[in-house]
């Protein structure tokens, strides 16, 4: 799925790049949190989140994981502080979405300068917070400012549409059409319930549809494609264990167990990222059957999170190997284990995936463009 996203003219590759960036930066912040200058990393994260939602909303699903890193780095665990964290995270989430994403542009209906008034009010709040040496308040307000600044890239859509280019989907060249475009109203509104959107008799109940189609077919299958194997490049492709022999999956599960045994808190952070960018998306989207195309591209954030456990699993195996091969000549043996891991997993995945993803000789896009 990562490979597919990388060669498709879509938003999902850059969206995952921003997700990976904010996750890397929050880990860097955790290492430097005792240094007051580390606040700059939090501000960079806020700006990247703003840029990211200018591409796709998936990036905001990393916010709970970011909040957990900050919490575990600054607080000792207690249920009271943990629930306080959850409340703050929910408030912060709603400030961004729907607050900045939907409500701020909607103020254009009141007046074209109303968003500018809000923007200036945030700047004024920053000035007084900094002047009063309110570190947390100033950090929060500057973060809001940077998120708005990053999100302002959406203005390019409005400017471009007013020039009436040949491709101008939804024609967002007026305030009404622009808000229609921002709110994705062309896709309709699907609620979380009921889950059953198909009366096919093969589904016995709403729960059966949710599990068999939405979870198993529309997520578990994609997840196993990445780490077990895919039997072909066609709609509805099944899982094929003969591709990767499930070695990446097993190494990732070992990495998860190793991570939990060594650092439960950071394991919970990665699990939160995995859950929010995977199964939580499934619950939110409430997809109907059938879908016009495969949707694996939307869940690459969770595949990225699991890949972290594959890396941790490889490190854990090397650590165990160094203990098993104690003595003066242990380095060549550990190097052999590393080489075997490299050949058995990434090299094998490259070899088995290359033909399916190679565009050599594929002129379909060119032919259609003519």
Residue ranges and their predicted role:
Residues 22-41, 68-79, 126-127:
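Membrane-interface transmembrane helices that cradle and orient dolichyl/undecaprenyl
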Residues 279, 291-317:
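Hydrophobic/aromatic-rich transmembrane helices and adjacent perimembrane loops
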Residues 17-18, 43, 58-71, 113-122, ...:
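Transmembrane-embedded, aromatic-rich helix segments that form part
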Residues 260-264, 312-350:
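Signature aromatic-anchored transmembrane alpha helix within multi-pass, membrane-resident enzymes
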Residues 4-12, 55:
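Short acidic/glycine- and proline-prone juxtamembrane loop motifs at membrane-interface regions
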Residues 122-130, 244-264, 316:
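Hydrophobic, aromatic-rich transmembrane alpha-helices
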Residues 161-258, 274:
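Lumenal/periplasmic acceptor-binding loop at the mouth of the active site in multi-pass
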Residues 41-55, 89-91:
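Membrane-interface alpha helices of multi-pass inner-membrane proteins
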